[in-house]
Amino acid sequence: MKEKESLNQNIYDNNNIVYVDKFNYDIQTIENNYIKEHYKIDKIKYDKIEKILEKIKLYKKNNIIPDNIFWKELRKISTQPGGFISIKNRREIYSFILDTLGKKPEFIITPSNVNEKQVNSYDTIIKNDCKRSVLHSIIRNNDNFQKYQNNKKINDSVYSNDSNDTQSTQVTQNESDENQLIVDTYINELMSFTKESLGNYEYFNYFQGYQEICLYFMIIFGRKEGVRYMTLFGKIYLDYVLSKNYKINFDMLLDILNDCCNIVNKKVNSLINKITKTKPYYSLSWLITYLTHSNDNIYNELSLLDYFITSNIGHMYFLSANIIVSEFNKIGTKFNITADEEFTYMELFFQHFQNLKVSVIDYEKIIKDNEKLNHRLFNDIISYRITNITNENDKGTLMLLNRNIYDNEIFDNLSIKTKLLYFLIAVILLFIFYKIFVK
């Protein structure tokens, strides 16, 4: 009894708590329905799950249960020592438990490159995802990644620690050793950063690509600001998932990212909502892909959204996949990304279309249409940033970018009638020139 009282006292002292009446936790219903109605599980797994559910019930007193403990114990159901429930069954178990709680998120996603035998602890899951994130970044953009490690602008850099500096100077035997040190250092730092930014939302690791987002937030903003941004994102995401019966799809991600943008930069957020005639669709995995193509220069006064939308005009299709959706629907195919379709990178997204043998879609046209759709958005945001940025380097970069956009795109954005008019004027001028000077 004293043990239980001590346990519950710790719960009261824990700031990371969730009230049961808000999210409607009903452990007994979960246990009864789970065991009696939905799944046939062998005796060993049954005993393990029963013990886990019993442990969860110990934490429940006075309508309070720590959210991190709840999800931590649920994870044990699907990552049992000595055995592993298949990914499919794990999703079924999670889906059932969440459904019993009155939540219906359809996004039960596991780390993409961790197979069943590898998953035996939370740290293993994080380390594998972090390793994948770091290695992917190096493979995709090795030059920029090397520059980041020496970027003195980044506060709290992973190389600000004296021990890391000493270690990095010692390992100089060959380029391979140096690269391995960079990878290992970033993996370890990213693991620490991820856990810190997750805070109470440890289970958020199961959201596809979280570590990859963390990596670039850490690189761009440094530890202190990066943790603040990622904590904000985790909180907003959690509020949506646990308080509303959302279908976790493009609309869901759009709402979450818009909320984040609204908090960070209300002007940009209002421009997005005002200018785009149809809802732009954001996919976090596309954002990740874009950041792996990151440019050399990242200035302090440029927000992440500024950096995202202004670095390269050629990547503008990331902002509004609704044109792709529209094209896809024109041929009578319903477009819907489910939890089982892990579109980690844009190439896989297009590959998915190709696998379906959808040859009627003109991808170049889609990208160009998206560029045109967002052209005004760029101009307004860039103009706004130019008038509000004090750093001359940042201002000069945006002004140069603004000019380059029009230099490259102005004729393409003209209507057919306008182009014909310009062509006719050019012909008339040539005719006049011929009459006057040739004869």
What are the functions of these language-model segments?
Residues 282-338, 423-427:
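Long, repeat-rich segments with strong aromatic
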Residues 1-194, 395-439:
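N-terminal transition regions in large eukaryotic proteins
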Residues 88-92, 181, 185-189, 208-209, ...:
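Residues within HEAT/ARM-like alpha-solenoid scaffolds
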Residues 105-152, 231-286:
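Aromatic-anchored, charged helix-turn/loop surface patch used as a conserved interaction hotspot
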Residues 203-213:
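Conserved phosphate/anionic-ligand binding catalytic regions in large, soluble enzymes, centered on
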Residues 227-281, 313-407:
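Extended, Lys/Glu/Leu-rich amphipathic alpha-helical scaffolds
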Residues 174-183, 194-201, 265-277, 281-290, ...:
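Active-site-adjacent structural elements in folded domains
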Residues 75, 79, 94, 98, ...:
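Amphipathic alpha-helical interaction motifs in eukaryotic regulatory proteins
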